[in-house]
A protein has these predicted regions:
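Alpha-helix C-terminal capping/helix-to-coil transition sites in glycosyltransferase folds
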Residues: 55-56, 135
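NAD(P)+-binding Rossmann beta1-loop-alpha1 motif at the extreme N-terminus of oxidoreductases
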Residues: 1-51, 55
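N-terminal Rossmann-like NAD(P) cofactor-binding module of classical short-chain dehydrogenase/reductase
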Residues: 60-61, 87
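Internal alpha-helical scaffold of NAD(P)-dependent oxidoreductase catalytic cores
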Residues: 130-214
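Short beta->alpha hinge that forms the Motif I/post-I loop of the SAM-binding pocket
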Residues: 31, 64, 89
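Interdomain hinge/lid region at the active-site interface
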Residues: 200-270
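Rossmann-like NAD(P)(H) cofactor-binding subdomain of soluble oxidoreductases
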Residues: 74-126
Length: 277
């Protein structure tokens, strides 16, 4: 198999290393020539993904920011042809899918939205690993949910990455869920660490602090773009969170022990309902 990868950051680099280890040919493109050169020297990338080589790929993975992914397919879509399956790996889906489904139809290539649910707080090719996606979920957003043959083909093409499960959904549902499961967590973590007390935490912190602050270490430009593209769903989640926090605050202001116990018990029960013990 020949795999084309656009963007050699953490996600694109991990795909490159995974497919290379599985014995496949990897062509890649990155706007940073030094990153591309390093990927070639490391052996993960076999050559340049050019306009001339796009049509020879079996799979093309677009692992760059959402707006850049759309721009790339607008500029190069005419050179892809019918052979490759194109999957973007962006963290939001509505903007990309709304633009790229029509582009795929116009230029005659096969496209699906995708979101590999894996990563670390580090970014860049040097942190990429061939096992990044092992047993991780992969979300797919096809134009036609009933195209079983295509979905089977996609799962086969993605097999070398080692995903544990695939979820098929719409761009709308993906973005609504991601606002809660990922984006809200990043906002809360990033805001939490801004407390003046944070600088004094050593010797007083353990697992709770580490859990709350892990994703505060993020790529600001990427996450800002993702937040703004999904601001309707994310702002709704923020409204819910702030309303809930005000209830805890009000209970403390009024020394309402029974009320505070009730709120905490509601949260404990909700966690059990959602995830079990």
């Amino acid at each position: 198999m020949t795999v084309g990868i656009v963007g050699l950051g953490l996600i694109g680099g991990s795909f490159a290393k995974a497919y290379h280890e599985a014995g496949h040919r990897v062509l890649a493109f990155d706007t940073d020539q030094s990153v591309f050169d390093f990927a070639v020297l490391s052996g993960a990338v076999d050559g340049l993904l050019s306009e001339e080589s796009l049509s020879s790929c079996d799979l093309i993975l677009i692992a760059i920011y959402p707006s850049a992914a759309v721009d790339y397919l607008r500029q190069h879509g005419a050179h892809i042809g019918p052979k490759p399956v194109v999957i973007d790996c962006c963290g939001t889906k509505r903007l990309v899918c709304d633009a790229c489904f029509p582009l795929a139809k116009e230029y005659g290539f096969t496209y699906l939205g995708g979101h590999p649910m894996a990563g670390t707080h580090n970014s860049g090719f040097k942190y990429a690993t061939p096992t990044m996606f092992h047993n991780a979920p992969m979300v797919l957003v096809p134009a036609d949910h009933n195209d079983i043959d295509l979905l089977s083909r996609v799962k086969e093409l993605l097999a070398p990455a080692g995903f544990g499960r695939f979820s098929i959904t719409t761009a709308e549902q993906h973005d609504e869920m991601i606002a809660f499961t990922s984006q809200l967590a990043h906002v809360v973590s990033n805001a939490y660490i801004k407390s003046p007390t944070a600088g004094l935490h050593k010797g007083f912190s353990a697992g709770s602090y580490k859990d709350m602050t892990r994703v505060a270490w993020l790529a600001p430009e990427m996450w800002a773009e993702l937040f703004l593209e999904n601001k309707d769903f994310l702002m709704a989640e923020l409204d819910t969170l702030m309303a809930n926090l005000r209830q805890y605050q009000d209970a403390m202001v009024h020394n309402d022990l029974p009320g505070l116990v009730r709120l905490l018990d509601e949260g404990r029960k909700r966690k059990e309902e959602v995830d079990g013990r």
